[in-house]
Amino acid sequence: MYSTFFSFCAIVLEKEANSMELNVREENLRNLFKQFQVEHNENCKTVFIDNNDEDLKNYLNESSTVYLHMVDYEIKHLDLSKVNTIFVNKEYASKLENGIQDEQRILELLLNKYPNLRVVLITDKKGAYYKDKDMMIYQKELVSNFDKDLFLVKYMASELKENSEMTSLYRGVNQ
């Protein structure tokens, strides 16, 4: 079983009875963020969730730390001010910002709307940006087998170990 702990939370591939963890179930690691389901209990305050998940609004109304994986364009109805971090690829981000193609401009516009948001933008150049109100980091791919789904898993595993954003970005991109 694979697990990474952050306070009382974990990403686990197998459900354990009576666990005090956030359980994310999926058949294998590479597909973890494609179609995952989140199981939440009252002791876990960190949630990793797709923006089309039917339980998202409930998590946004709680005191959870929400990591939001953007999988479709319909977010205008969501209050992103309650989201800690969003993961979005350039195609989706461009559509959110009226077709703008410049990655740095997309990041700037998202942060203008939501100043406390942390954004991880996966580019079509085989790399990724991290941006928050204090810094911006770009990490280009150093190897030639960039996989966007594996990027998400590796980034989150690093973040849950309380590594810096720079370290998490590097580990996500360089699989």
Give names to the regions the model predicted:
Residues 175:
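Short arginine-rich
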Residues 2-138, 160-171:
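Ribokinase/PfkB-type carbohydrate-kinase core domain
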Residues 138-159, 172:
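Short glycine/threonine-rich catalytic loop with a Thr-x-Gly-x-Asp
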